[in-house]
């Protein structure tokens, strides 16, 4: 049986591939601004975003992939669905809390490196300099762990 969060992870990261293949395929989704992408995010995942923002979907925290999906629902998707509105950032505090909890459980180490980018990015979105520095430190460590051939890709994030 497919995990409930799998459609979100497939949409965000694709179904497979190396970090460079995933980034080439999904980079515009991640870092582009397109009304069509924002609409697709709202139509496909808007209900989940609202549930996550309301404190729901906590059962997803039991597995690293579910944790990642929940973090995306709180941090990345609101920035698309509620673009140019304060609600775009309404999941940031909960996302930071969940990221800290997941890191304490070593969930980040169980994800693919390209997935970990979006975990550490949550800390970089913080208004708190100490939290930002934590994200930067973890990201520097992630880059250093990559094969030489992937370091340039990861250095761009």
Locations of the language-model features?
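Intrinsically disordered, low-complexity activation-like regions
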Residues: 1-84, 89-157
């Amino acid at each position: 049986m497919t995990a409930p969060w799998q459609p979100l992870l497939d949409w965000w990261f694709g179904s497979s591939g190396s970090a460079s293949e995933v980034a080439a395929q999904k980079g515009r989704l991640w870092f582009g601004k397109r009304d069509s992408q924002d609409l697709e995010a709202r139509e496909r995942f808007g209900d989940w975003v609202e549930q996550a923002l309301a404190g729901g979907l906590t059962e997803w925290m039991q597995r690293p992939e579910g944790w990642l999906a929940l973090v995306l629902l709180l941090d990345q998707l609101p920035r698309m669905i509620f673009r140019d509105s304060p609600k775009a950032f309404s999941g940031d505090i909960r996302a930071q809390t969940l990221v800290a909890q997941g890191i304490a459980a070593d969930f980040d180490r169980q994800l693919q490196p390209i997935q970990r980018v979006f975990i550490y990015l949550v800390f970089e979105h913080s208004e708190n300099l100490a939290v930002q520095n934590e994200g930067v430190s973890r990201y520097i460590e992630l880059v250093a762990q990559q094969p030489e051939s992937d370091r340039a890709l990861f250095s761009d994030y």
